[in-house]
Regions:
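N-terminal small-domain helix-loop-helix segment of the aminotransferase-like
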Residues: 2-5, 11-110, 166-178, 299, ...
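Conserved glycine-rich beta-strand-loop-beta hairpin in the small C-terminal domain of fold type I
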Residues: 39, 310-324, 336-352
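Conserved PLP-binding active-site segment of the aspartate aminotransferase-like
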Residues: 41, 268, 349-356, 373-415
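Short, solvent-exposed loop/turn segments at secondary-structure junctions
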Residues: 43-47, 112-113, 141-144, 194-197, ...
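Conserved core of the PLP fold type I
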Residues: 70-217, 222-243, 248, 420-438
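Conserved core segment of the aminotransferase class I/II
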Residues: 131, 150, 243-317, 329, ...
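Conserved PLP-binding catalytic core of the aspartate aminotransferase-like
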Residues: 335-370, 436-438
């Protein structure tokens, strides 16, 4: 049966971003069973023994409690499981000196669902018929943002400033405030901090500047804090959440070891929370109460924050250091390659300036050498101009073993050297690929 789809149905029934590439990656992994394939594409967190044990302990406590039946055998409120809301409120008030009430917090079925709710509550066509943009102020950013709106043309990203250190082969992105437009045509602003895929951590000053620009037009700012402190605390540089009247602090417990339970948290102004809660009631009623109940125990006890700092962060920070050292050794110093500063998250982001082939071609040729990465172009959702930089980057996951990361860097270095050294006719270069990235 092939029912006719609406315009929205057509939009939402297609895979976007990395999810479209994952089909090819899965087929490659299945076809390559028995081969030595190094998979640096994964977004799933590593199952760390201490973290798994925490969730086992919290589950055992829930099973033994008198409230078990009330948690899993009954519906709850759309706002979320009350003990979890209380645990988050108390922790944030104590940790950051806030004065949150229960009405400042909403629990959602994952942070992706939260951004979908916000995108379609604040972005797109308003009652007057005017389009309100969903502004991504720092591109590249999370590929999933490309699929959150029922009105895809509402998503608008801005090219960043690139800060290079040629001697160390490092770089980082920063918002280009001379180009960034947040005005009466903006519905809301969204960015990740730390950033997936780059690991970039926007400074407090930059976050506050974005929030101030938005506040002048009564525009909410959603900060995707899926990798931020206090849990999972996947920041490798000092940072704290930034709060403000128009800032919605958005968390996920996926990288804290609960991706299967789909738990997102929004913290912000009650007026914004109320809109999203009503949307969620119509959308899915509420998030899984089982996941909320075990999360409430982990947060209230302090165990989740402690293990995030003592186990989760050091694990991935060490992996980044291993990969960075291996890349420094494997990639020639005279080639224009740059590794984004390791500021957080579970990925490394590589830029090959003036790359003679596209990132998609590099991805395909790396597969032939037994290394699976993610090409960078899906991480520029909403970017309107034709920027060669979008076809010059790769995302590498830090979930592989130390030995696999080192071997992958060696294979990548050999291939990239061949690509840059080859005559244009052999490298597959095209004029559009042979121009500087800026």
């Amino acid at each position: 049966m092939t029912p006719e789809l609406t315009r929205f149905g057509e939009e939402m029934s297609h895979l976007t971003g990395v999810r479209a590439i994952m089909k090819d990656i899965i087929e490659t992994l299945q076809a390559g069973q028995g081969q030595l394939l190094i998979n640096l594409s994964a977004g799933n967190p590593v199952i760390l023994p201490e973290i798994e044990q925490l969730w086992r302990d919290c589950t055992q406590a829930l099973l033994a409690s008198a409230e078990y039946g009330q948690v899993v055998c009954r519906y709850g409120t759309s706002q979320g499981y009350e003990p979890l809301i209380a645990a988050i409120k108390d922790d944030f008030n104590q940790r950051y000196g806030l004065a949150l009430s229960d009405r400042n917090i909403l629990i959602t079925p994952g942070s992706q669902a939260l951004y979908f709710l916000a995108a379609n509550a604040f972005g797109g066509y308003h009652a007057t018929g005017r389009m309100k943009d969903i502004v991504l102020p720092l591109s590249p950013d999370y590929t999933g943002y490309g699929g959150i709106s029922l009105v895809p043309e509402a998503v608008r990203a801005y090219r960043p400033t690139i800060i290079q250190d040629e001697a160390s082969h490092r770089f980082r992105y920063r918002p280009d405030f001379s180009q960034l437009a947040i005005d009466e045509n903006t519905g809301f602003v969204l960015f990740s901090r730390p950033c997936n895929p780059t690991g970039n951590v926007l400074s407090n000053a930059d976050v506050e500047h974005i929030a101030n620009l938005a506040a002048a037009h009564n525009v909410p700012v959603l900060v995707d804090s899926a990798y931020a402190p206090p849990y999972p605390a996947l920041n490798f540089t000092a940072m704290e959440p930034v709060f403000g009247e128009n800032i919605l602090h958005c968390m996920s417990l996926s990288k804290a070891g609960l991706p299967g339970e789909r738990l997102g948290v929004a913290i912000g102004d009650p007026a914004i929370i109320q809109v999203l809660e009503c949307f969620q009631t119509n959308f899915c009623i509420h998030s899984s109460r089982y996941g909320q109940a075990i999360a409430a125990r982990a947060i209230a006890s302090g165990a989740l924050a402690q293990l995030s700092e003592q186990v989760i962060r050091p694990y991935y920070q060490d992996k980044f250091a291993v990969l960075a050292a291996a890349l420094d050794q494997a990639l020639p110093q005279d080639l224009p390659w740059y590794l984004h500063n390791g500021e957080g998250a579970i990925f490394a982001w590589l830029w090959f300036d003036q790359l003679p082939i596209t990132d998609q071609e590099l991805y395909q040729r790396l597969k032939q050498r037994g290394v699976i990465v993610v090409p960078g172009h899906p991480f520029f959702p909403g970017l309107r101009d034709n920027w060669p930089h979008t076809r010059q980057c790769l995302r590498l996951s830090l979930t592989a073993s130390r030995a696999e990361l080192a071997e992958a860097a060696t294979r990548l270095g050999a291939l990239v050297t061949e690509v840059y050294r080859a005559p244009p006719s052999q490298s597959g270069a095209t004029p559009s690929m042979a121009v500087p990235a800026r």
